[in-house]
Amino acid sequence: MTAFAYIGAALAEIAGCFAFWAWLRMDKSVWWVVPGIASLALFAYLLTLVEADHAGRTYAAYGGVYIAAALLWLWAVEGAKPDRWDLIGAAVCLGGAAIILFGPRGG
């Protein structure tokens, strides 16, 4: 469930933020904000589904997933292919997220 929650949250957050970007930077209608706000609310809800004891740890691990998802958005939606530095950076971030998620926790 955690992986699905993180991936869904990332897509919802990016879509919500992109709606504001489209309105303010691409001269789209202000009505783009309506689904953007709904998407951002969905993002916040989905993070509550992550199985973790502390919100801060959930958000920290989510950061790596968000970065990778943002690069996929860059490629799939905006049509700009990530370069090797983007991919190396995303791999480092996902590695950090994995350490946060799966690292052994002492009592």
From Swiss-Prot:
Q: Which Pfam families match?
A: UPF0060 (PF02694)
Statement: the UniProt record of this protein carries the keyword Transmembrane helix: yes
Tell me which GO cellular component terms the UniProt record holds: plasma membrane
Q: What are the protein's UniProt keywords?
A: Cell inner membrane, Cell membrane, Membrane, Transmembrane, Transmembrane helix
Name the major location.
Answer: membrane
SUPFAM superfamilies attached here? Multidrug resistance efflux transporter EmrE
How is this protein positioned relative to the membrane? Multi-pass membrane protein
Task: From the record, give the transmembrane residue ranges.
Answer: 4-24, 30-50, 60-80, 87-107
Where does it localize? Cell inner membrane
Q: Which family does it belong to?
A: Belongs to the UPF0060 family.
The name this protein carries in UniProt is UPF0060 membrane protein Sala_0701
Q: Please name the source species.
A: Sphingopyxis alaskensis (strain DSM 13593 / LMG 18877 / RB2256)
